[in-house]
Amino acid sequence: MLETLYQEALKRKKEPKEGSYTSYLYDKGLDKILKKVGEEATEVVIAAKNADKNEMANETADLLYHLAVALVETGVSLEEVETVLQARQGKQSRIHDRPEIDHY
C-alpha cells in the first residue's frame, strides 16, 4: 500500500490534475507539504494518547499520504527509505537517557 501511495503521489507530480488535493499541495510547495506532515504527525500523537484505534488508523493514513507527497517533492524514493531501514535492521541501538536540564 505504501508503494501505491508513493506511485500515486509521483503520478500526480508528473501529471497535475485540476481539483486534485495532491496537485494543490505540489503547487503550494514544500513548506505547505511539510506543514501538513507536521499537522498530521501531531494528530497521530493525539490519537495515540486518546487510545482511539479508529482515529489512530485514520490519522496514520493521513500522515503516510503526506509523507509520500513529501518524499516525491524532495526527490527521495521509497527504495532509498527501504535501504536505510534494511541497513538499520538488527543493529543495536544506542538508546540512553538525556541528562537533566538544570540551567535554563
Swiss-Prot record:
Q: Which reaction does it catalyse?
A: 1-(5-phospho-beta-D-ribosyl)-ATP + H2O = 1-(5-phospho-beta-D-ribosyl)-5'-AMP + diphosphate + H(+)
Which cellular component terms (GO) are annotated to the entry?
Answer: cytoplasm
Pathway in which the depicted protein is active: Amino-acid biosynthesis; L-histidine biosynthesis; L-histidine from 5-phospho-alpha-D-ribose 1-diphosphate: step 2/9
Record keywords: Amino-acid biosynthesis included? yes
Q: Where in the cell is it found?
A: Cytoplasm
Query: What's its EC?
Result: 3.6.1.31
Give GO MF terms, alphabetically.
Answer: ATP binding; phosphoribosyl-ATP diphosphatase activity
Q: Which GO terms describe its biological process?
A: L-histidine biosynthetic process
Kindly indicate whether the keyword Lipoprotein belongs to this entry.
Answer: no
Tell me the keywords, alphabetical order.
Amino-acid biosynthesis, ATP-binding, Cytoplasm, Histidine biosynthesis, Hydrolase, Nucleotide-binding
Q: What is its main location?
A: cytoplasm
Q: Which domain of life is it from?
A: Bacteria
Which residue spans adopt a coiled-coil conformation according to this UniProt entry? Answer: none
Family the UniProt entry places it in: Belongs to the PRA-PH family.
Q: What is this protein called?
A: Phosphoribosyl-ATP pyrophosphatase
What organism does the UniProt record list as the source?
Streptococcus sanguinis (strain SK36)
